[in-house]
């Protein structure tokens, strides 16, 4: 009986000694099975900076904003252009009754101008706009002209309530936007104007040469 009791005690001691060693592989396997943060998105889906693991270094730039790709900038710029066209279209509906709805016309037109300018800023890129906002770059003439025309339009519509000045401010906004958008072209604004005027003159000369 003494030998049986001693063998039972030895068996229990061996079981207690081998229990932590057997538990460690289970914990290790469980930790290995857990995916990293952001891995559930898959390799084909965009991985945002806030879904990264703690071992990875933080991305360069602002932590509160995700990195915007070129395709996302194009989509956002196109959406801003569509909204700007919608605002311009609604403002055009108020053009026949401009004397009665001058304030709504100015607000819609100004909002369309702001959206069109935001589209141009998105297409240009965030670093360039950041340098402009920090004062590292001098604002262009089109930027200053647009800001002045926008402020004058809002002042004329909301404060002075002058129809003539509101219409002049809206025309100045359109001119500033066209000048800015032409300046964003790769070949420059002067070359684009020359090409447009050359095609216009060519079409006019051809129309004059054709018999009526």
Swiss-Prot record:
Record's subcellular location: Membrane
Transmembrane segments: 79-99, 105-125, 143-165, 175-197
A biological process term (GO) from this entry: protein transport
Pfam families reported for this sequence: Got1 (PF04178)
Any one cellular-component term (Gene Ontology): cytoplasm
Record membrane topology: Multi-pass membrane protein
Chain ranges on the Lumenal side, renumbered to this chain: 100-104, 166-174
Presence of keyword Repressor: no
Keywords: Membrane, Protein transport, Transmembrane, Transmembrane helix, Transport
Cytoplasmic side: 1-78, 126-142, 198-212
Family as reported in the entry's similarity comment: Belongs to the SFT2 family.
Main function: May be involved in fusion of retrograde transport vesicles derived from an endocytic compartment with the Golgi complex.
Protein's UniProt name: Vesicle transport protein SFT2C
Species for this entry: Mus musculus
Lineage, uppermost ranks: Eukaryota, Metazoa, Chordata, Craniata, Vertebrata
Gene name per UniProt: Sft2d3
